[in-house]
């Protein structure tokens, strides 16, 4: 018989830096999950990623207090800020432009994000990422 899911916990955790302190500890502790077991498993799976990159993770907690988790790709905003070399987006994206990204950078980001996007093909994924870039106050070249 399949285990019954009692909760889904959605978190954004820095790659390779999961530890029992907030936000991980309290979120998992209230469901009775072994926090250190999650931290070790998460850090092991994010070993190949850039350390410190925010990784969205969905943790399924079962009735016997065991868990499984699914990692997503880092947010588009994080990847765009890294590509443009900026620390934050614009407070007024339509008037204040804070950086530039070109089509090659957008394609690289879209390739990374493709498993999590609902885009039908690569061109649609690039347009989706370009829209995110524009809403952050970045100039988009070549799209």
Curated annotation (Swiss-Prot):
Modifications after synthesis and translation: One or more lysine residues are methylated.
One protein family per Pfam: Ribosomal_L11_N
GO cellular component terms attached to this protein's record: cytosolic large ribosomal subunit
InterPro entries per the UniProt record, alphabetical: Ribosomal_uL11 (IPR000911), Ribosomal_uL11_bac-typ (IPR006519), Ribosomal_uL11_C (IPR020783), Ribosomal_uL11_C_sf (IPR036769), Ribosomal_uL11_CS (IPR020785), Ribosomal_uL11_N (IPR020784), Ribosomal_uL11_N_sf (IPR036796)
Xref: NCBIfam families: L11_bact
Protein family (similarity comment): Belongs to the universal ribosomal protein uL11 family.
Biological role: Forms part of the ribosomal stalk which helps the ribosome interact with GTP-bound translation factors.
The protein's name in its UniProt record: Large ribosomal subunit protein uL11
Species of the source: Cellvibrio japonicus (strain Ueda107) (Pseudomonas fluorescens subsp. cellulosa)
